[in-house]
Regions:
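N-terminal targeting or regulatory segments adjacent to alpha/beta-hydrolase or S9 domains
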Residues: 1-58, 64, 100, 136
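Proline/glycine-enriched tight loop/beta-turn segments at coil->beta junctions
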Residues: 67-70, 77-87, 93-100
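Alpha/beta-hydrolase
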Residues: 88-90, 143, 250
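Cap/lid segment of the alpha/beta-hydrolase catalytic domain
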Residues: 92-203, 213, 260-261
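Flexible loop/turn segments at secondary-structure boundaries
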Residues: 95-97, 148-151, 230-234, 254-259, ...
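Primarily recognizes the serine-hydrolase "nucleophile elbow" in alpha/beta-hydrolase
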Residues: 200-277
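The feature captures the conserved acid-bearing segment of alpha/beta-hydrolase catalytic domains
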Residues: 256-317
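C-terminal catalytic histidine-bearing segment of alpha/beta-hydrolase fold enzymes
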Residues: 320-353
Length: 353
């Protein structure tokens, strides 16, 4: 089979031929690019409180120093008495930016429009996993990260050129337009600023960790969990924040080499911080810290190859060397976080309290 120009370019540039066997936290932070300083005063505000199906949900907001304020849900069991083990729940990408936290957390009936309910049905076993985790005795913080939900942008804020290329500026096409904006324009801004998509998301998530640590409902180190884009963000927190208790990453692990070439387009820029691949393979992001890491692989994942996932698992298992810091499991499902996977992840988190 004839090599494509992209494959030939990769070979000409030596892609994958100079991997550093010891990727460090400093390497990752360098390739995440510039990040704003976390404000000393985040202005955390408690707003409304709801009770839904055995869970108390408090709406919170805070300011990260730029852009729109972050809105979040704090979920605890209704009968909770005193501080609980904390979990930061990172919502998925889904090419759906109008909503973030609402994909995984429920505070009232009819919270998501029917047009967005496919995310719950196809990706989360038709339930709100953050609520299920809270019912198990955890305090769960779920926040919108840039550029989703409250941290997102309106149709009017999209560059005119995006609307021209797409051929419409209709609000019904907002999600398609936002995907084009992320792929075509946002990274240009970030490149000019010396930043990356992964770095800006990591910033928002580290701010959320600081908020979580300040909440009276949460005690001790905080765990992190996420599917897909949320799983990618969880891996970056695993690599950059040694204070975390444990991390579950679902549907976000394979080798960089296997993502080329038919699998690179479906992925967000968050997987590809500038030149990180020159320092190591993607699985090495999970080797920097000894923080317990549970990686769940979707065996029939349409976003990764079976070989790429198997190779990543082998690399992580070899690095762990039987120390018990890494656990990897394969499930015969497409890209999703099924009820079975959720129960396994929640059981594992409970063992690391």
């Amino acid at each position: 089979m004839t090599a494509t120009p992209f494959e030939e370019l990769g070979k000409a540039l030596g892609f994958g031929s100079h991997l550093n066997p010891d990727m460090t936290r400093e390497d990752v932070l360098l390739h995440l690019g510039k990040m704003p300083a976390i404000p000393a005063n985040l202005g955390v505000a408690r707003e409304e409180e709801f009770e839904y199906d055995g869970v108390r949900i408090t709406t919170l907001s805070w300011k990260v120093g730029w852009g729109k304020p972050t809105q979040a849900f704090l979920l605890t069991p209704i009968d909770a008495n005193g501080p609980l083990p904390g979990v930061l729940y990172l919502h998925s990408h889904d090419d759906l930016k109008e909503f973030g936290k609402e994909k995984v957390a429920q505070h009232q009936e009819r919270q998501l429009p029917e047009s967005a309910m496919w995310v719950r049905r196809e990706h989360y076993g038709d339930r709100a996993p953050a609520n299920e985790l809270a019912k198990r005795g955890f305090a769960v913080l779920v926040h919108d990260c840039f550029p989703w939900g409250s941290r997102g942008f309106s149709l009017d804020e999209l560059p005119p050129r995006i609307k021209e290329i797409h051929g419409t500026a209709d609000s019904a096409e907002f999600e398609n337009l936002s995907v084009m904006f992320e792929s075509l324009s946002l990274n240009k801004y970030l490149s000019l600023y010396g930043a990356t998509m992964a770095g800006i998301l990591n910033f928002d998530d580290r701010v959320a960790l600081e908020v979580a640590k300040s909440l009276p409902e949460i005690s001790g180190p905080i765990s992190v969990i996420g599917l897909s884009g949320g799983g990618c963000r969880a891996l970056f927190l695993h690599a950059t924040n040694p204070e975390i208790r444990a991390v579950v990453s679902t549907g976000a692990m394979a080798t960089y080499a296997s993502m080329l070439h038919e699998h690179i387009t479906p992925h967000s820029w968050m997987f590809f911080p500038f030149d990180l691949a020159s320092k190591g393979e993607w699985p090495q992001i999970g080797m920097i810290s000894d923080t317990p890491l549970f990686v769940q692989y979707c065996g029939d994942d349409q976003l990764f190859t079976k070989e790429g996932m198997a190779d990543a698992h082998a690399m992580l298992e070899k690095h762990d060397g039987g120390r018990g810091h890494y656990r990897g499991e394969f499930y015969p499902v497409r890209h999703s976080f099924t009820v079975e996977m959720q129960e396994a992840a929640f059981d594992w988190l409970a063992k690391h309290v």
